[in-house]
C-alpha cells in the first residue's frame, strides 16, 4: 500500500553519510565553525546545522499524564537553579545573533506556568537575525489557561502554538492526565484558531490499549476545527514500565486506522527538517470534509539524519538530542562571568558531539536521566 511506502525513512539531506566524511575532515572542533561570511552556526560532525531551538522554561506541570510522570508528581527544581528571565534572554540573543538559530519554541513542563512568559516572548520577538529578520516563535502547551492569555501572547510576538491533546473523550482524558480539565483545553483550541495562529497544531501521543480508539475521533474533531492533528509514536521518555518497543502503536497502525475513515494522500509540500510526514485527508463518507494530518514516527522511522534542533533546559544546560544522556551546562559559566563568545563556544562544542541517531533500537539503549517534563518537547 502506498501509505506504507511513504513511511520508509527519507534519505538524509545532502547525502549525510557522504557529507559527514568530507565535512569531518575540514571542520575543526576548536572554533565555532563559522562559514566564509563569518556568521557562526551550530553544526555537528555529520554536517547537520541546528536552526531550531527548544527552550524549556519550567519543569513544572499542572497535569500528571500517566506516560510522563507519577501521580504524586516529581520534585521540581528550586527556583535558584533555574534560569531567570534575563539569563534566558541573554542565551537566546547568543543563539540568534551568534549561532544562527532561526526558530525558537518554548516548552516546559508547562510553559504557561512560567511567570512573565509574555515578557520573555516579547524580548525574543525583539531579536533580529543577521539578515534583519524576526525569529519564528512557537509554544508547546497542554492548553490549560491558554484561552485567557492568547491575545497577550500573540501581541507579544507569538507566531504559532502546539496544543497537546491525546483524547477528546472526557473520561479517558481524566484517566490519562489525572485531572478533569478537558473543557479548558477545547476552549483553548477554539481561542488559538480564532486568534489566527495558523496552523494550530494538536499533538496526540498514541498508546497501546489506552487511546487507539481516539485516532479517528481526534482526526474528525481537529479537521472540523481547522487544526492540524499530529499523531506521535510513544517514545521511551516517561516511567520505564510505560514503554515496550514491541507493544507500541506504530505509525503504520495509526495510518491503517485513519484509512478506515479517510482517503489519504501524501502532502506535496517539502518536509525539510520537520518531524511529521503530512497527509491530505478526505472523509470517505463526505468528500467535502478535508484536512491535513501529520504522523511523527520517531521510533519506527526516525528523522535523525535531518534533525536541526538544539535544546536548552530550564536549569541552563544544552542537550544536543532529546535522548542524550550527556549535557553541557551553561548556567554556571554565565553566572561566573563568561562572555557571549565563551558561552557560544560551549554551545557549539555541545552540538558538535551530537550522535548520528537517537539509538532507541540499539541493544545498549538507555533512557535519558531527565524525564520528558524536564527536557521539553
From Swiss-Prot:
Enzyme Commission numbers on file: 4.1.99.22
Cofactor, how bound (note): Binds 2 [4Fe-4S] clusters. Binds 1 [4Fe-4S] cluster coordinated with 3 cysteines and an exchangeable S-adenosyl-L-methionine and 1 [4Fe-4S] cluster coordinated with 3 cysteines and the GTP-derived substrate.
Highest taxon in the source lineage: Bacteria
GO MF, one annotated term: GTP 3',8'-cyclase activity
Protein keywords: 4Fe-4S, GTP-binding, Iron, Iron-sulfur, Lyase, Metal-binding, Molybdenum cofactor biosynthesis, Nucleotide-binding, S-adenosyl-L-methionine
Reaction(s) the record says it catalyses: GTP + AH2 + S-adenosyl-L-methionine = (8S)-3',8-cyclo-7,8-dihydroguanosine 5'-triphosphate + 5'-deoxyadenosine + L-methionine + A + H(+)
Pfam families: Mob_synth_C, Radical_SAM
Gene Ontology annotations of biological process type: Mo-molybdopterin cofactor biosynthetic process
Residues reported in the UniProt entry to bind S-adenosyl-L-methionine: 67, 109, 164, 235
Residue ranges of domain Radical SAM core in the record: 45-271
Region named Disordered: 1-29
Binding positions for [4Fe-4S] cluster 1 per the UniProt entry: 61, 65, 68
Pathway: Cofactor biosynthesis; molybdopterin biosynthesis
InterPro entries noted in UniProt: Aldolase_TIM, Elp3/MiaA/NifB-like_rSAM, MoaA, MoaA_NifB_PqqE_Fe-S-bd_CS, MoaA_twitch, MoCo_biosynth_MoaA/MoaC, rSAM
Keyword rRNA-binding included in the entry's annotation: no
Cofactor: [4Fe-4S] cluster
Residues where GTP binds: 54, 105, 140, 201, 309-311
Annotated [4Fe-4S] cluster 2 binding sites: 304, 307, 321
Description of how the protein assembles with itself and partners: Monomer and homodimer.
PANTHER family in the cross-refs: MOLYBDENUM COFACTOR BIOSYNTHESIS PROTEIN 1 (PTHR22960:SF0), MOLYBDOPTERIN COFACTOR SYNTHESIS PROTEIN A (PTHR22960)
NCBIfam families: moaA (TIGR02666)
Described function: Catalyzes the cyclization of GTP to (8S)-3',8-cyclo-7,8-dihydroguanosine 5'-triphosphate.
Family, per entry: Belongs to the radical SAM superfamily. MoaA family.
Official protein name in the record: GTP 3',8-cyclase
Organism field: Corynebacterium glutamicum (strain R)
Amino acid at each position: 500500500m502506498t501509505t506504507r511506502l511513504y513511511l520508509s525513512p527519507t534519505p538524509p539531506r545532502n547525502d549525510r553519510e557522504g557529507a559527514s566524511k568530507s565535512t569531518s575532515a575540514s571542520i575543526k572542533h576548536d572554533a565555532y565553525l563559522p562559514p566564509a561570511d563569518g556568521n557562526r552556526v551550530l553544526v555537528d560532525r555529520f554536517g547537520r546545522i541546528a536552526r531550531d531551538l527548544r527552550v524549556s522554561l519550567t519543569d513544572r506541570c499542572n497535569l500528571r499524564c500517566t506516560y510522563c510522570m507519577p501521580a504524586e508528581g516529581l520534585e521540581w527544581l528550586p527556583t535558584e537553579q533555574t534560569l531567570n528571565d534575563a539569563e534566558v534572554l541573554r542565551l537566546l540573543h547568543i543563539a540568534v545573533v551568534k549561532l544562527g538559530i532561526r526558530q525558537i519554541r518554548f516548552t516546559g513542563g508547562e510553559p504557561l506556568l512560567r511567570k512573565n512568559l509574555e515578557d520573555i516572548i516579547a524580548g525574543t520577538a525583539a531579536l533580529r537575525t543577521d539578515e534583519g529578520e524576526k525569529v519564528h516563535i512557537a509554544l508547546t502547551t497542554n492548553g490549560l489557561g491558554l484561552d485567557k492569555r492568547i491575545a497577550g501572547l500573540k501581541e507579544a510576538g507569538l507566531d504559532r502554538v502546539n496544543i497537546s491533546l491525546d483524547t477528546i473523550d472526557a473520561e479517558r482524558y481524566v484517566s490519562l492526565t489525572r485531572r478533569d480539565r478537558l473543557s479548558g483545553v477545547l476552549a483553548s483550541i477554539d481561542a488559538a484558531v480564532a486568534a489566527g495562529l495558523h496552523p494550530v497544531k494538536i499533538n496526540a501521543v498514541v498508546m497501546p490499549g489506552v487511546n487507539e480508539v481516539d485516532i479517528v475521533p481526534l482526526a474528525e474533531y481537529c479537521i472540523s476545527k481547522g487544526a492540524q492533528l499530529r499523531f506521535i509514536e510513544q517514545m521511551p521518555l516517561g516511567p520505564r514500565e510505560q514503554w515496550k518497543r514491541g507493544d507500541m502503536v506504530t505509525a503504520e497502525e495509526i495510518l491503517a486506522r485513519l484509512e478506515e475513515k479517510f482517503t489519504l494522500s501524501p502532502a506535496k509540500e517539502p518536509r525539510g527538517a520537520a518531524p511529521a510526514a503530512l497527509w491530505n485527508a478526505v472523509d470517505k463518507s463526505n468528500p467535502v470534509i478535508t484536512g491535513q494530518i501529520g504522523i511523527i514516527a520517531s521510533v519506527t522511522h526516525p528523522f535523525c539524519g535531518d534533525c536541526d534542533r538544539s535544546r536548552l533546559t530550564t536549569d541552563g544546560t544544552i542537550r544536543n538530542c532529546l535522548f542524550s544522556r550527556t549535557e553541557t551546562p551553561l548556567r554556571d559559566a554565565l553566572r561566573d562571568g563568561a562572555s557571549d563568545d565563551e558561552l557560544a563556544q560551549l554551545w557549539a562544542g555541545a552540538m558538535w558531539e551530537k550522535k548520528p541517531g537517537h539509538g532507541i533500537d540499539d541493544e545498549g539503549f538507555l533512557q535519558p536521566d531527565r524525564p520528558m517534563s524536564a527536557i521539553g518537547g
